[in-house]
Every structure is written in structure tokens, then in C-alpha cells.
Amino acid sequence: MNTIRRLFLLVAIVFYGNTLLPQSSAYQKLSLIMTDLETGETFVNKNGDQLLTPASITKLITTATALEILGDDFTFKTTVQIDGILENGIVRGNLIIKAGGDPLLGSHYLENTNFLSTWSSILKTIGIKHIEGDIVADVSVFDNNPMPKGWCAPDLGNYYAAGVYGLSFCNNMLQVTFKSGKTGTRPKIVGISPQIYGMKIDNRLIAKRGAGDCASFVGEPYSNIRKAIGYIEANKKNFTIKADIGNPPMALLGALRDTLLRNGITQSGTLRMDVEDVPSIERIRYPLFIYYSMKLPDIVKLTNYHSNNMIAEHIFKYLSLQKAKQGNFKDAIEVVKEYWYSKGLDVSKLDIYDGSGLTKDNKFSAEFLNRMLIYMAKTSKHSDTFFNSLPVAGVSGTVRNLLRNTSLSGKAYLKSGSMSGVQCYAGYIVRDSKKYSMVVMVNDFRGNRHKTVQKIEKMILHEINQYEQQ
């Protein structure tokens, strides 16, 4: 009977693999693997060893590695310092923001986004009335390369490709609001948030009836110029599109100086950024206070629930500090690979270049990710934290529409990953007393994404139901 069941499953897998996508998608690639976490039986393994583009399920590797290495109590730390004496309310030197890689300073995900007012109040309480020197962003925690290898030029300038900086601000995201007129006219900029001194929007947008949002931004790292291109819907009073902030450290310093002035603290010097740990004129620094982020489990949940590239990349780059003095992507890759190699996973099936999955250069096997999911569920002391970071299919996050109105709605805890020609899901399925790990990766499909997702849903349901009916 068991042999018959396995033969049936093999036929079913081949059938679903060949009919997963519409007829126009003849060149699609599929991997599917499912494991019963109680028995350890991998009851489905369709092409599990092939290397495919994962898109955002890469974030599972980043967040799991961070939990394992950094731990539940980890927080990012930003230290506010001075390098001169405080005399009669005057700082005889510079005010320095020693960055710690925190991606959430001013984040809209937080209840209190006005952290600069908190900083200003503390400085005023200390007795500071005037700063003779500069306000400095010490961003030496990371190198000065904010973009991972493989990020495409057309993505740069857009909010989802925000760079990785030692000092970040407002999710490194700029919201630009336009007012559009009739078709063929150029929309007017009516709002920019946050306000950034020296920021310039080169507006090349055109209003077009029926366009919806066909707009994007173009811009280079460390530049305050963002070009808006494409089309937006005609005759809209408020139409907001998102760009990245080209120079977050300097944007934060500008906002801090404005906040200090409103609080009665003046400054004589300039704003500047140091990428080296020691300023050009070495002076002793005196810490005034440390500003802590939320703890890592909450950051991991934000990352996986919202599939936020910017947060994932900051976590990823921070991991490199396990072996490097300055955060960088090359060492981050090595740290991730070395960790999972130490746990017995085959890292020859792991080829990554970023921590979010934005680059198409990333490739790994469903088997590798499934093995990691099994480890996190059965061995890791961070099992519950990792599991609870995943959105629920049919209910929340990026999978709120997946498996809705099916027997697995509310019972599949999955991270999604999608880009052109790519649709992936990975995580856990919990039904009654059974718990499964699951990875499905589809590459090179053509045509309708919605139909592709429907086929994936049917395949998942079929394999789970078939296994439980044995």
C-alpha cells in the first residue's frame, strides 16, 4: 500500500509540475518540497536540489541567521557624543551621532516617530544651549557602498531599493505627493515628506487617464536629486509615490539641526559625514546618551511581515561585523554561509548577494531553505520567535490573499517572494496536530501571475490532503 501511495504521489507531482502554469509558460521551472516535522519524512521533493531565484523568501535566511547569531535581546545602538568640553551651556567642539546601523530611526512602523525631539530634549536637559563645532554623522559602522551586488539600475532611486547606510532616516523613504490635471499635462508637486534641505525632484511625470501608478524614480546614492518618470492618473488632487532618500545621514542631520533650533539650541558649524572611525583631527569623544532600537524579534517580525527590503539589508550588513571591523556585503555573505555550514547544511546550494532578495543574482535550492526551516523549527532556541514573525496565509501581510477560503486559510505561516517571472512561498503549515515545513519556488513563468498563484495553491492543498489521507 505504501509503495502504491508513493507511486501515486510521484504521478501527482509530475502532473502538477507539468500543469502548474498556463500553456504560455512552457519554460517555467518548479521546485517543491514538504516535510512532516514530527516524523521527519520529506513526502514531496520535486526538483528540490535545483538552484532558483528566490526573491523575498531570501529574507527568511537573513532573519533566521540574525536571530541565531545576535539573539533575542539584540538592539541597534546609536550613540550621541561630543568631542569637546561643555562649558556654560556651550559645547566647545562637535556634536557627533555615532551610528550603529539602526534601520528604524524615524520609521513609520513605530508608534513614536519623533525621536529627534527626544534627542533634543535630552540635550537641553543636559544643559546644552549652543554647539560651536559641527554636527557630525559618524557612519563608520558600515562601508560607503550602500547597494548590494546585482541591484538593477532602474530600481535605484525607488523606495524598495533604498540603500544601506550606517545612519538611516524614516526608512530611507521619501513620499512625494502630486496634483495631476488633464491627460498630457505635467503634475505639480504639492508635498514632500520628510522635508529634506537641498532635496530636488526633477519632475518628468505626465498625467494620463487610466494610467494608475506607472511612475518611478531614478537617482544615485548620496545624491539629493531624484528624477520622477512615467505616468500617473489624471485629475487627482493627491497622488503620492515613493522614492528613496539619497543621503539619509545628511537628511537626518538636517532634521536634527532644525529640531535643535526649535528647542533653543543653536550651532555655529556645518553638517558633515565621517565614514572613518577617527575624525581628521583626533579628539577624545564623550558619550552623552545611547538611543536603543526595539529588540531584534520585533525587527524580524517587521521584516518578514512587511517584506521590507531596507530593514532586511541593514540586518544582513550588520551580520558582517561578526568578522569585519566595518560592515560590508562581502563579509555578510560569508557569515551567513559559515553559520549554516556549521549546522550541517549544504551551502553549495546557497548563492546569495543580498539579504532581501531584490537581486536576481541570488540563487538557492528549495532543499537548502527547507533544511533551514526544519532546523529553526526543531533545534533553534529561537523557534517561536522565528515562527511568529511569519504572516498568516489568508489573513495577514503579503500572503493575506493566499489560500483564502480554503482549508489552509489561517493555518499556513508563509513568506512570499515575487518579481518578474518569479513566485515563491516558504514557511510552515499547521493543521490540527500536524506541522509541516514547505518551500515552493517557481521561476521563468510567463503570463498571468494570479493564475500562477492559483495553481500553486491547488498544488499545496493537493499534496497536504493526499499525505494526510494515507
Task: List each model region and its residues.
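Short active-site loop at a secondary-structure junction
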Residues: N45-T65, I69
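A short glycine/serine-rich beta->alpha loop
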Residues: K46-L52, K242-A243, L358-T359
